[in-house]
Amino acid sequence: MRLARRYLISGRVQGVGFRFFAQAAAVREGLHGWVRNVADGRLEVRAEGDIEALECFERHISHGPPGAVVEDFDVTDMGADGRDTGFMIR
């Protein structure tokens, strides 16, 4: 079953390579979507794929790369629409 999820991650998540870390994890899991910095200092991610792949992806990004400090990790289920191909850094 395909599912899409939106993640809002706060803490020390910008300037530590988090977007590249998230992209690498998403590509490993075969997910499609994107990751971007938000003006308020958070990171926003939209990922679409199989539930098992999303859960594995979440385990990685809930901690982030070395140097990151995740203080809040918000997950919202969304409808999968298949619009994204690959996983992009925005």
What are these regions (language model features)?
Residues 1-90:
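Intrinsically disordered, low-complexity, mixed-charge
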